[in-house]
Each structure stands twice: as C-alpha cells, then as structure tokens.
C-alpha cells in the first residue's frame, strides 16, 4: 500500500508497517504489530499516555500527548522521538497561557492537536 500525504513536504522517514497477510480482523485501519508503542507509566507522574498529535520536527518527531494521572485527570505533555516508535516523554506538563500571556493551566486537557500556521505550531 502506498502512503500519500497531500499538501505537505515529503516524509521519507515516516514509520510505516504493511498489514500482515494473515491479519483477520475486519478493521479497515492497520496500525502497528507492536502496539502500544508507549506503555503504562512512561514517567512517574503519568499513569497512562495517549498519542494525540505527532509531527516531523528537526531530525525526528515531536508529539503532544494526553497523559492521565493516577487520579484519571489528563494533562498535556511533550514527547520526542528519533524514529516515531521509541519516545521520550518530558516529565513537566506543557504550560499554557491566556491571551495576555498569563499562566492558565487547563483543568482537563483532552485530545490535544498540533496546528501549524506559517512557521509556528499551536496546541489546540
């Protein structure tokens, strides 16, 4: 299967794995045979982590991640990867600011996304 991304520069190092010939589930989407790529407790502060947005960055990838605490409350964290499979997750939560630049941490950060506008990425 060929992967075609529209309106973006070529990504020659994007990790991709073909669906195994013996894959029997009817799901139309094949992911990766060794999922999950991030296990439980990736840092002492995070009980579970979910990939929400990954983008190519410099010589690898960055991701904004929903990291659920032991109490179930999610916050946003930043991850770095050279290959898109093996990740290092920062221990500090991503700091947010309001329109005036004042610190404003969301009480519940769920399903963050990255949007690139010109040369700047924004977390929404």
Task: Kindly give the residue locations of the regions a language model identified.
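Beta-rich carbohydrate-recognition and catalytic domains
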Residues: 1-107, 115-124
């Amino acid at each position: 299967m060929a992967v075609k991304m529209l309106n973006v520069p070529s990504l020659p190092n994007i990790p991709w794995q073909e669906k195994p010939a013996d894959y029997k589930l009817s799901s139309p989407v094949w992911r990766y045979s060794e999922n999950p790529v991030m296990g439980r407790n990736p840092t002492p502060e995070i009980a579970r982590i979910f990939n929400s947005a990954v983008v190519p960055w410099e010589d690898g990838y960055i991701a904004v991640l929903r990291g659920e605490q032991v109490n179930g409350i999610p916050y946003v964290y930043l991850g770095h990867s050279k290959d898109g499979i093996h990740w290092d997750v920062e221990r500090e939560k991503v700091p947010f600011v309001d329109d005036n630049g004042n610190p404003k941490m969301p009480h519940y950060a769920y399903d963050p996304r990255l949007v690139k506008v010109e040369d700047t990425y924004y977390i929404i």
